[in-house]
Structure formats: structure tokens, C-alpha cells
């Protein structure tokens, strides 16, 4: 605070001689220093190396109040959407990028006045409107006598019938309009990558079927104890992920990739499996890393965490980077059969389908078993048919009898 002086003039009382002592006196008072609200510029967060830019979609407008960590905008990249929160409570002062504009990491997004409050809009007070009195009811008219009907002449009775006039046809129910919606960055990137895979890879698909009887029985017997110990439900996906890791270790070519820049084959001694997850915004493929070191509980826990983040639109770009193999489960939508498309730059993808009761031959007898078709699409430039068929049979054996995993068979 600072000290100020003010000179006050005082008039003389009657009979008092004017002097410098009684004409003025000094009054001291204190003032507070005025603190202005801090204005900060919020920038685009850094992206992963595989992402260069994104499209901005604003959740707030200029003048809106925000609390700390409240989402101000969302940046849609090729792989996921990144939410940008407010670093502090305050008011949006200025938007530096238009809605739908492209930004890179570190681009200034908006200006925030910290600690400010939004101006409340003046509430307009309207005077109560007196309802108009209802109109008086119309006067009741006296009944009018109907005129007598003259007799119909004989010629009219013998007249020929006249055809009724043609009525216009009723209009067709429902419209036939069209609408155009701009492709989102994620949808556009998915389309580009799928076409890239089709144009680059020599894709071939091999099929097999899996008897799910044993894995269903194992789940029924141990699901309660599994949930009690690990606090996570036991599903079927972990069995296929673990079986895929087992088969990838046995057939390293399926886990490898072609480096087009050097014309070399890159073999990986680790297994990172991408699991396709459908979201309202499109298909995302978060990665389960080092699956070869995981047990069923670790896999189920990771799948559950990644699925929850995908449904809440909280996946980071780092969650989807990399991956040496992909599993897509169309069975959750009731798929019977299908051929998945490779997720580049990977060399193969496993497609799971629905479990249906079908008659199968067991020891020379027909039995009804829960069966699932599985499909492996692979890049024939790198993976031979023998390796692909052997790989799929490894998965079939491990799922039908999980003891094969324990015995490393």
C-alpha cells in the first residue's frame, strides 16, 4: 500500500481571524495496489513422434468461465482425440485458432485471464401480461325449419351413373433428401491406411475353426475365484491374446515387418499386440506391450483399462503407437465369418468371430459344440502359407486346450 496526502480547506468560524493554521490541514490516507488478472496463453500439447498435426474442436467460447482442468477444446489427430484442459480457473479471453483449424505441437491455442469471472448477462425483467378476457360465447340461434324435399322426377331415377372425379394421389411418406458430412481426421486416416494396406501388401487369408468347449468350461469353473483374487473378470479375449503371443514366438516371421526403405526384414524378439476397439468416433487399436511376459490376469487387466480409456475418449497417442500384431474381434457384433485387413506396417492380423452352436464330428459321432471361425490375414511377401497355417493351428491348439501353454507345445 502507499501513503497519500490531501489538503482540506477549512472556513473560519465567526470572529476568528483567518490564518495559515486554520485555513488548511493535511489528512493522510492509505491506498491498496491494484492487481490485474494474469493473462496466460495456452499452447497445444506435444504430440507423439508419429503424429504431426491435429484439428481443433472448441468446447468453450470467448467470455466463458472455466474451472481448473475443465476441457476447453479437443484436438483430433490421426489416431485419437487429445483433450486440452484449462490450467487454472478464469475466463476465456481469446481463441487463437478457428474451429476446425489445424495445429501442431506447441501452437498457441487460446488466452485465459486467470482469476476472472464471466460477466453475468443482465436479466431482463418483463412485466406480467394480463391475460385478455375470453370472448363472449356466440348467441344461440333458434332452430330453423328444414325445407320440404320435392319429389324426385322419374327421368332422374333413370339417369346413367356419372363416374366420380379422379382424386390426386397422396404424397409419398418420408423424404428422399441427402446430406454431406465432412470426414473426420480419424475417419480419413483410417480410410487412407486401409487403402495403403491393400495397395502395398500381398494379402492372403487362411481360416480355421476353434472348439470353445474347454475354454468355456475353464471360465465357468474358475471365474469366481479369478475375480476374487485379481479383482477382474475372466473373459475369452485373454486366452486368444496369450495364444497369439505363444504362436508369434513360435513363428517369428508373422511377428516381423518389412522395412521398405532398406529392403530388410525386421524380426522382433518382443510381442506387442494391438487390440481393435470400436468407439463412436471410429476404430482404435491400443497396444498391449510385452504380452509374452504376461499371465491371464495381467492381460485382462490391461485390456479392461485400455477399453475404458477408449470408451471415455481418453486414449493417448502413446497408447496406440507401435504394435507387432493385431487381433480384431468381430464376434462381439455377431459376426459369423470375415477376412480382416492388415494394420500397416504390421504383417498379419487375427480375426475372431462369434461363438455359435454347430454340429461337429467328434470321435466319429456328431455332437453340438460351441464353435468359432478364426481368420488370419497375412502379408504373403513376408509370410509363407506354411508359416501362416502353422501359426493359426498353434492358436487353435492353445485355446482348445490351455494346458498346451503350460507345456510350451
Swiss-Prot record:
Gene3D superfamilies: 2.40.50.100, Chloramphenicol acetyltransferase-like domain. The active site is at 380, 384. One of its GO terms (molecular function) is dihydrolipoyllysine-residue succinyltransferase activity. Residues 39-113 form the Lipoyl-binding domain. Keywords: Acyltransferase, Lipoyl, Mitochondrion, Nucleus, Transferase, Transit peptide, Tricarboxylic acid cycle. Residues 121-180 are annotated as: Disordered. Its cofactor is (R)-lipoate. Residues 1-36 form a transit peptide. Binds 1 lipoyl cofactor covalently. Its EC number is 2.3.1.61. Pfam families: 2-oxoacid_dh, Biotin_lipoyl. Pathway: Amino-acid degradation; L-lysine degradation via saccharopine pathway; glutaryl-CoA from L-lysine: step 6/6. Residues 131-141 have a biased composition (Pro residues). InterPro entries: 2-oxoA_DH_lipoyl-BS, 2-oxoacid_dehydrogenase, 2-oxoacid_DH_actylTfrase, Biotin_lipoyl, CAT-like_dom_sf, Single_hybrid_motif, SucB. The modification N6-lipoyllysine is found at residue 79. It is found in: Mitochondrion matrix; Nucleus. It catalyses: N(6)-[(R)-dihydrolipoyl]-L-lysyl-[protein] + succinyl-CoA = N(6)-[(R)-S(8)-succinyldihydrolipoyl]-L-lysyl-[protein] + CoA. One of its GO terms (biological process) is succinyl-CoA metabolic process. Transmembrane segments: none annotated. GO terms for cellular component: mitochondrial matrix; mitochondrion; nucleus; oxoglutarate dehydrogenase complex. The 2-oxoglutarate dehydrogenase complex is composed of OGDH (2-oxoglutarate dehydrogenase; E1), DLST (dihydrolipoamide succinyltransferase; E2) and DLD (dihydrolipoamide dehydrogenase; E3). It contains multiple copies of the three enzymatic components (E1, E2 and E3). In the nucleus, the 2-oxoglutarate dehydrogenase complex associates with kat2a. Belongs to the 2-oxoacid dehydrogenase family. Dihydrolipoamide succinyltransferase (E2) component of the 2-oxoglutarate dehydrogenase complex. The 2-oxoglutarate dehydrogenase complex catalyzes the overall conversion of 2-oxoglutarate to succinyl-CoA and CO(2). The 2-oxoglutarate dehydrogenase complex is mainly active in the mitochondrion. A fraction of the 2-oxoglutarate dehydrogenase complex also localizes in the nucleus and is required for lysine succinylation of histones: associates with kat2a on chromatin and provides succinyl-CoA to histone succinyltransferase kat2a. This is Dihydrolipoyllysine-residue succinyltransferase component of 2-oxoglutarate dehydrogenase complex, mitochondrial. The gene is dlst.
Amino acid at each position: 500500500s502507499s501513503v497519500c496526502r490531501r489538503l482540506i480547506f477549512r472556513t473560519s468560524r465567526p470572529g476568528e481571524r483567518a490564518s495559515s493554521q486554520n485555513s488548511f490541514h493535511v489528512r493522510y490516507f492509505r491506498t491498496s495496489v491494484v492487481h490485474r488478472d494474469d493473462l496466460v496463453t495456452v499452447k497445444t500439447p506435444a504430440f507423439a513422434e508419429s503424429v504431426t498435426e491435429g484439428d481443433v474442436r472448441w468446447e468453450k467460447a470467448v467470455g466463458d468461465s472455466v474451472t481448473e482442468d475443465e476441457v476447453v477444446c479437443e484436438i483430433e489427430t490421426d489416431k485419437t482425440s487429445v483433450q486440452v484442459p484449462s490450467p487454472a480457473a478464469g475466463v476465456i479471453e481469446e481463441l487463437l485458432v478457428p474451429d476446425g483449424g489445424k495445429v501442431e505441437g506447441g501452437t498457441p491455442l487460446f488466452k485465459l485471464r486467470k482469476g476472472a469471472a464471466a460477466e453475468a448477462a443482465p436479466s431482463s425483467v418483463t412485466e406480467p401480461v394480463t391475460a385478455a378476457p375470453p370472448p363472449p360465447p356466440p348467441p344461440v340461434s333458434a332452430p330453423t325449419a328444414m325445407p320440404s324435399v320435392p319429389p324426385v322426377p322419374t327421368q332422374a331415377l333413370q339417369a346413367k351413373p356419372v363416374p366420380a372425379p379422379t382424386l390426386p394421389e397422396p404424397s409419398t411418406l418420408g423424404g428422399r433428401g441427402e446430406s454431406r458430412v465432412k470426414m473426420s481426421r480419424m475417419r480419413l486416416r483410417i480410410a487412407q491406411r486401409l487403402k495403403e494396406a491393400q495397395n502395398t501388401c500381398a494379402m492372403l487369408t487362411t481360416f480355421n475353426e476353434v472348439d470353445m468347449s474347454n475354454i468355456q468350461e475353464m471360465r465357468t469353473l474358475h471365474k469366481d475365484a479369478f475375480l476374487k483374487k485379481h479383482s477382474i473378470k475372466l473373459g475369452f479375449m485373454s486366452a486368444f491374446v496369450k495364444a497369439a503371443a505363444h504362436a508369434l514366438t513360435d513363428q517369428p516371421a508373422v511377428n516381423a515387418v518389412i522395412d521398405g526403405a532398406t529392403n530388410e526384414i525386421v524380426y522382433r524378439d518382443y510381442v506387442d499386440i494391438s487390440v481393435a476397439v470400436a468407439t463412436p468416433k471410429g476404430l482404435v487399436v491400443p497396444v498391449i506391450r510385452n504380452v509374452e511376459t504376461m499371465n491371464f490376469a495381467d492381460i485382462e487387466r490391461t485390456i479392461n483399462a485400455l477399453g475404458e480409456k477408449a470408451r471415455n475418449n481418453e486414449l493417448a497417442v502413446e497408447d496406440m503407437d507401435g504394435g507387432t500384431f493385431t487381433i480384431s474381434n468381430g464376434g462381439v457384433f455377431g459376426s459369423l465369418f470375415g477376412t480382416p485387413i492388415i494394420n500397416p506396417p504390421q504383417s498379419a492380423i487375427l480375426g475372431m468371430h462369434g461363438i455359435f452352436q454347430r454340429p461337429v464330428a467328434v470321435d466319429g459321432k456328431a455332437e453340438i459344440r460351441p464353435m468359432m471361425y478364426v481368420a488370419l490375414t497375412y502379408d504373403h511377401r513376408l509370410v509363407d502359407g506354411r508359416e501362416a497355417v502353422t501359426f493359426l493351428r498353434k492358436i487353435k491348439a492353445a485355446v482348445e486346450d490351455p494346458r498346451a501353454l503350460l507345456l510350451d507345445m
